């Protein structure tokens, strides 16, 4: 019961409202608020009232404008960057080394036989276009050539360029010219790409024939190697004991057994030192070459694939532990016959994350499936971009590219199963839409480590020491008293920390919530002398205004609802005498003038005396409905 009574009182209080009019509320607010200005509006003369009203309105607008500026600045999520440098004991970076040639030519020559013969014939046609090709074309296998041929574009007449097939089938869109030839100065080599049915063809132009034949050979070699089993490809590459001749980390000796092998399609067998997958990460506590990693490599360039690897040297990359080495995009070359010294400075980037920076902690919030997770590596933006491209490749070309990991259940592209894959792949590779889509979907890592390298080189070995160094290395690797190595095939590497080995770049919010509140309060206090309590007072009067408005609207709706069912009077309103008679005719007797049908008076008809006092004031005479009334006791209790 007490709860019900309390709720009833609350209901009556809500129905009654604040008990003030709009004007009374405004006057009360101006008299009681702690904000400067409103009190002067009601206490001064007419002129000062107008002046203070305008000043208060102006400063209130200034405060609102300044608040909008500060809130907009806060919601822009700007960051400030702090930089710190120094030297400390750090984990030595993972070092990935590869050979420029992915395979030994002696082991893949049987796979590339037809392609190499075709390549030699192409070079002959480019270098000697007037020579006879009848004997050459008879022994060539044109199966590969027919899928993606090279053509010559005769641009001696810019208005009517002529497209010529290298092996005799000359054609032009308007004027065929069989047997036409042109020299290298007047022609450009291009690659013709056609769809499966041959109805749609495009030409990919190059500024140099070297670029054209290299890209064409790599494209055809990709088709061949994509059909070879992965374990067979590993066997065709360079073995670790053949490429890694010597290893020293600080004062501790190491060997090829301290390297983790990984197959990278562009460079074949690669080897990673200090990757941290199965072994403990090695630290480095001192700067200088004596405390770093020293390697001697044999790249064996005498066994390079002639048309596949045109660069001789070692390809290497420094990266963080448990990350996949994207050595094609981020690696560097070390030249054969030199000693290359690499001083390392570690940049640690610590981004703030959403909403300040569009980055990800581990890639879990990225829509692209990371295909490199099969290597148990961490997320990187390169892994996301490559996975995104492979996803587009599968959706548009129905097959995956040989250079990227393959999702489960899919097949690599090749000319036999997917005849127009090259046309689809090169169109997708040049698509701006595809690149923009992948860039918009992939995010940078919030915590990233980059290695800045200072590189210096010198000839190694020197002429004076070349003989004995090559003898020793040949004896250690091949147990031969003769020199089996060449200066053109060996590379020496020194990788070490510099004097300052780390630099931390950290983001922090430029504007936090404390900054926002202090600026909002400062502007309000400066222009109007207010505080948080003044805002609460203003909020209170706004609530009262809304309260009064709602009560008035409810009362107006109720009044309209009551008036609608009442029918208008058919005659004139009753007089006072008739109203009094209604209260005095207790027996509900008929009128004295009423008669029977034949003029006879009713026998029980009586004339009652008219009272001398007015009728009592019963509740039934109230003009206001009961549901809007409340007792005096309830009002006093509230």
Curated annotation (Swiss-Prot):
Explain what the UniProt record notes about the effect of disrupting the gene for this protein: Scnn1b homozygous knockout mice die within two days of birth, likely due to hyperkalemia. Serum sodium levels are reduced, while serum potassium is significantly elevated. Urine electrolytes show lower potassium and higher sodium concentrations in null mice. These mice do not exhibit defective lung liquid clearance, nor do they die from respiratory failure, with only a slight increase in lung wet weight observed.
The GO biological-process annotations, alphabetized, read as: aldosterone metabolic process; artery smooth muscle contraction; cellular response to acidic pH; cellular response to aldosterone; cellular response to vasopressin; epithelial fluid transport; erythrocyte homeostasis; gene expression
Domain of life (superkingdom): Eukaryota
Q: How does it sit in the membrane?
A: Multi-pass membrane protein
Tissue specificity statement from the Swiss-Prot or TrEMBL entry: Lung and kidney.
The record ties this protein, via Gene3D superfamilies, to: Acid-sensing ion channels like domains, YojJ-like
A GO term for molecular function = ligand-gated sodium channel activity
Those parts of the protein on the Cytoplasmic side are 1-50, 552-638
Phosphoserine is found on 631, 633
Residue pairs linked by disulfide bridges in the UniProt entry = 98-270, 182-187, 194-201, 247-254, 359-446, 384-442, 388-438, 397-424, 399-413
Where is the protein localized? Apical cell membrane; Cytoplasmic vesicle membrane
- Enumerate the transmembrane spans: 51-71, 531-551
Regulation of catalytic or functional activity: Originally identified and characterized by its inhibition by the diuretic drug amiloride.
Q: Which Pfam families match?
A: ASC
Query: Which cellular component terms (GO) are annotated to the entry?
Result: apical plasma membrane; cytoplasmic vesicle membrane; external side of plasma membrane; extracellular exosome; membrane; plasma membrane; sodium channel complex
How is the protein altered post-translationally, as described in the entry?
Ubiquitinated. Can be ubiquitinated at multiple sites and undergo monoubiquitination and polyubiquitination. Ubiquitination by NEDD4 or NEDD4L inhibits the ENaC channel through endocytosis, intracellular retention and degradation of its individual subunits. However, some studies could not confirm the ubiquitination of this subunit of the ENaC.
Q: Which residues are glycosylated?
A: 135, 141, 205
Reactions catalysed, as given in the entry: Na(+)(in) = Na(+)(out)
Where can the motif PY motif be found? Answer: 614-618
Q: What ranges does the record give for the region Disordered, renumbered to this chain?
A: 594-620
Give residue ranges on the Extracellular side: 72-530
Keywords from the UniProt entry: Cell membrane, Cytoplasmic vesicle, Disulfide bond, Glycoprotein, Ion channel, Ion transport, Membrane, Phosphoprotein, Sodium, Sodium channel, Sodium transport, Transmembrane, Transmembrane helix, Transport, Ubl conjugation
Subunit:
Component of the heterotrimeric epithelial sodium channel (ENaC) composed of an alpha/SCNN1A, a beta/SCNN1B and a gamma/SCNN1G subunit. Interacts with WWP1 (via WW domains). Interacts with WWP2 (via WW domains); inhibits the channel. Interacts with the full-length immature form of PCSK9 (pro-PCSK9). Interacts (N-glycosylated) with BPIFA1; the interaction is direct and inhibits the proteolytic processing of SCNN1A and SCNN1G and the activation of ENaC.
Question: Which family is annotated?
Answer: Belongs to the amiloride-sensitive sodium channel (TC 1.A.6) family. SCNN1B subfamily.
What does the record give as the function of this protein? Answer: This is one of the three pore-forming subunits of the heterotrimeric epithelial sodium channel (ENaC), a critical regulator of sodium balance and fluid homeostasis. ENaC operates in epithelial tissues, where it mediates the electrodiffusion of sodium ions from extracellular fluid through the apical membrane of cells, with water following osmotically. It plays a key role in maintaining sodium homeostasis through electrogenic sodium reabsorption in the kidneys. This subunit is not essential for ENaC function in airway surface liquid homeostasis and proper mucus clearance.
Name of this chain's protein: Epithelial sodium channel subunit beta
Recorded source organism is Mus musculus (Mouse)
